[in-house]
């Protein structure tokens, strides 16, 4: 079984919606939480968020993974300055321009039910490097979880990805803001 990763503007929007499913957090959020802020993503306007995502898909801001032709995974990737939540976050110990559009950010993964634990997120994390570089990024960064060995994670925490997936792809840890979170970066 081969996992392929493509920029989202090279696949059907229906593939993204298949990955998100009809219910649950991904279907409700439409990957707008980091773009709109947490309160706005919980409004009842799912259709409005879906249309925002459609526009981002046209711009190529994201990746889709297929397993033997079946859509199985999504990863949000765009200039860091596109994410309102990241611009509003306090960055203790980091002194850089949050609006620098040459730094791209990976904020969210969705793996379709029935296809988890098969390397989908790892393939997507690795795929962000070429896509960001091709779009003119100077670097790509992510904010993954680093759960303690043998410890359970709370439902939904891993939507930002696992630290190990990014390290395996060649990202370097640049900051550790908490015991369970790292900031990783791949410089071009």
Model-derived regions: residue spans:
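Conserved acyl-donor/pantetheine-binding loop and adjacent beta-alpha core of acyl/acetyltransferases
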Residues: 66, 71-116, 150-160, 167
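Conserved active-site alpha-helix within GNAT-family acetyltransferase domains
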Residues: 133-138, 146-176
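Active-site beta-strand termini and strand-to-loop segments that position acidic
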Residues: 66-68, 185-188
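Short hydrophobic/aromatic beta-strand or adjacent loop that forms the aromatic wall/cage
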Residues: 60, 179-184
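Conserved hydrophobic beta-strand within the GNAT/NAT acetyltransferase core sheet
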Residues: 106, 140-142
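Conserved acetyl-CoA-binding loop-helix of GNAT-fold acetyltransferases
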Residues: 106-111, 117-134
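Conserved N-terminal entry element of GNAT/NAT acetyltransferase domains
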Residues: 1-39
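A short helix-loop-beta-strand connector motif used in the catalytic cores of GNAT acetyltransferases and
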Residues: 41, 47-64, 81-87, 105
């Amino acid at each position: 079984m081969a996992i392929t990763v493509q920029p989202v503007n090279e696949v059907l929007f229906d593939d993204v919606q298949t990955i998100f499913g009809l219910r649950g957090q991904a279907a409700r959020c439409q990957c707008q939480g980091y773009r709109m802020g947490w309160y706005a993503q919980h409004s009842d306007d799912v259709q409005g968020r879906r249309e925002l995502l459609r526009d981002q898909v046209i711009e190529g801001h994201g990746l889709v993974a297929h397993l033997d032709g079946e859509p199985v995974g999504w990863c949000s990737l765009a200039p860091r300055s596109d994410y309102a939540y990241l611009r509003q976050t306090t960055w203790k110990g980091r002194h850089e321009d949050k609006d620098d559009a040459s730094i791209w950010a990976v904020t969210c993964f969705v793996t379709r039910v029935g296809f988890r634990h098969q390397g989908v997120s790892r393939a997507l994390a690795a795929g962000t490097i070429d896509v960001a570089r091709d779009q003119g990024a100077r670097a790509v960064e992510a904010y993954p979880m680093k759960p303690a060995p043998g410890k359970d994670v709370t439902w939904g925490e891993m939507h930002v990805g696992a630290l190990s997936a990014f390290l395996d792809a060649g990202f370097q840890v640049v900051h550790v803001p908490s015991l369970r979170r790292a900031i990783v970066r791949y410089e071009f």
